[in-house]
Amino acid sequence: MRNTDTPIAVEGYPFIAGFAAATLLLALLGQFLHLGFFVPATLFFVLTVFTVFFFRNPERVTPGDENTVVAPADGEVIFLGKVIEPHTNGEFEKISIFMSVFNVHVNRAPISGKVVDGFYTKGKFFDVRDERASFENEQQGLVLETAAGLRMVVVQVAGLIARRIVCYAKTGDSLSRGRRYGLIRFGSRLDIYLPLGTRIDLVMGQKTVAGETVLGILP
């Protein structure tokens, strides 16, 4: 897997460079040609600052207990319950986290384990707060297995605005809990399917911090 420890996620560099270049160009044109470029230059400057903010990639302090499942994403819990996960066709405890454009969008491994399977599904782009998004939207998933043999599934879901999923991990990789493994651009959702018997330690509407907030304790 790639190095993901930069303070700004590398996927944001092209956007930041483009907006910054446009800001500089418009400012120079306005300065030397005395043209009315102040407003568009200001607009692109604001876009540059927002893009830096959006692709921020802060360090996190992950709890030490290996049986603890941590949040894979910053955001708000919008679903809790038992479901059948469509890729494995198994029953799991499902937690869905909605990431707004104001949240950090870097995703982190919820547990330490090996990636035993990965899948990508083309799909639609429903609003990710709509439960249909879990099953019908474009998505990238990983099946993780712990050292104790427990399996769980973590799925990055694209949304109405977010249509670019980035996943660094692949089948055969080993992930440590809290490690960065991907991101989704510009607002999205992340679904995590935990083994039955996991003690869930959060409630609907709760805010989560990737790599730090405890979702539950494995059985």
Swiss-Prot record:
Modifications after synthesis and translation: Is synthesized initially as an inactive proenzyme. Formation of the active enzyme involves a self-maturation process in which the active site pyruvoyl group is generated from an internal serine residue via an autocatalytic post-translational modification. Two non-identical subunits are generated from the proenzyme in this reaction, and the pyruvate is formed at the N-terminus of the alpha chain, which is derived from the carboxyl end of the proenzyme.
According to its UniProt entry, the protein's GO biological process terms are: phosphatidylethanolamine biosynthetic process
**Would you say which domain of life the source belongs to?**
Bacteria
Q: Under the GO molecular function aspect, what terms does this record hold?
A: phosphatidylserine decarboxylase activity
> What's the protein's topology in the membrane?
Peripheral membrane protein
Site (Cleavage (non-hydrolytic)) location in chain: 187-188
Q: What class of enzyme is it?
A: lyase
Cofactor mode of binding and number, as noted? Binds 1 pyruvoyl group covalently per subunit.
Which coenzymes or cofactors are required?
A: pyruvate
Which of UniProt's keywords are assigned here? Cell membrane, Decarboxylase, Lipid biosynthesis, Lipid metabolism, Lyase, Membrane, Phospholipid biosynthesis, Phospholipid metabolism, Pyruvate, Zymogen
Q: Which family does the similarity line name?
A: Belongs to the phosphatidylserine decarboxylase family. PSD-A subfamily.
Q: Which HAMAP family match?
A: PS_decarb_PSD_A (MF_00664)
Q: Kindly provide the name given to this protein in its UniProt entry.
A: Phosphatidylserine decarboxylase proenzyme
